[in-house]
């Protein structure tokens, strides 16, 4: 009978050892550039792929607006987060988030759009106008575009409308003369909005958004997630997942890959000196 007891104990221990590394679901947060519903539809297939590949349960998260997303990053509420280059530089320093991956063959560029019938033809024409932006700390859509206007000594009144979608809609409806955005979100905006807009200006390229992990995530778990992203990048049968988020693949990344953004002198969310 003793051997039966030992066998039962060994079976129990084997079962415990077979439990997933992450019994509690991981959170995969995406910076709120569009409506939560649209983002969930776009990103859930990627999250499902990573979850199935790693065996980790992963829940999609976003926030009602960019300031809330920033507050959650500051508090370390997300295990994995897709964040803009500015956020990564700030929260790598302040909260310890670590770079894991980024989009392959990609640089991020800010752009300014106007209504297609607008008389505005040059940046100088924006002098004295109201310009819509998603949020104060939106890297390409706000920081890069507004920095360029200031560099050219063009005075303008910034208005923050919480999302990229809201920027495009506000310009399309004539609420503001121009708005800041990025190519990907402009291309994915509704046709009836996009077709009414014209790109006035586009910036040079910077290292794109980061997929970063919480500083407390185990190295083995980071590697498993990275392996999933790299596997997806080479799985032609799943290319539709990447196409859904506008990516052509992922590459492994290090914190230093965002040194071009650090060179801009951005120190904090409250004082972007650009």
Where are these regions (language model features)?
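N-terminal signal peptide c-region/cleavage motif recognized by signal peptidases
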Residues: 18-20
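Extracytoplasmic small-molecule ligand-binding "clamshell" domains
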Residues: 23-87
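Short loop->beta-strand "edge-of-pocket" segments that line small-molecule binding or catalytic clefts
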Residues: 26-33, 39, 124-141
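An extracytoplasmic/periplasmic, membrane-proximal ligand-sensing/linker region
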Residues: 26-30, 34-45, 212-213, 217-274
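Short helices/loops that flank or line small-molecule/ion binding pockets
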Residues: 67-81, 94-95, 124, 165-180, ...
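Hydrophobic/proline-rich hinge and linker segments of small-molecule sensing/allosteric domains
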Residues: 99-122, 210-214
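Pocket-lining segment of extracytoplasmic ligand-binding domains
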Residues: 118, 129-220
């Amino acid at each position: 009978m003793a051997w039966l007891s030992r066998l039962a104990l060994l079976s129990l221990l084997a079962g415990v050892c077979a439990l997933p590394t992450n019994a509690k679901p991981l959170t995969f947060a995406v910076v709120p550039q569009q409506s939560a519903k649209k983002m969930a539809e776009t990103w859930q297939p990627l999250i499902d792929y990573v979850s199935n590949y790693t065996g980790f349960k992963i829940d999609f998260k976003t926030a009602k607006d960019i300031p809330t997303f920033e507050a959650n990053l500051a508090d370390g509420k997300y295990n994995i987060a897709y964040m803009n280059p500015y956020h990564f530089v700030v929260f790598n320093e302040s909260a310890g988030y670590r770079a894991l991956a980024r989009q392959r063959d990609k640089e991020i560029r800010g752009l300014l759009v106007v209504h297609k019938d607008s008389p505005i033809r040059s940046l100088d024409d924006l002098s004295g106008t109201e310009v819509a932006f998603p949020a104060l700390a939106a890297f390409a859509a706000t920081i890069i575009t507004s920095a360029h206007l200031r560099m050219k000594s063009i005075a303008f009144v910034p208005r923050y409308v919480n999302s990229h979608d809201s920027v495009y809609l506000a310009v399309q409806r004539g609420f503001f003369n121009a708005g800041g955005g990025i190519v990907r979100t402009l291309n994915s905006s509704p046709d009836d909005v996009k077709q009414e807009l014209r790109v006035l200006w586009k910036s040079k390229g910077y290292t794109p958004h980061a997929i970063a992990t919480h500083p407390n995530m185990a190295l083995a778990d980071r590697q498993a997630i990275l392996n999933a992203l790299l596997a997806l990048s080479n799985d032609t049968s799943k290319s539709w997942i990447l196409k859904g988020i506008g990516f052509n693949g992922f590459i492994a990344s290090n914190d230093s890959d965002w040194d071009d953004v650090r060179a801009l002198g951005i120190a904090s969310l409250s004082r972007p000196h650009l």
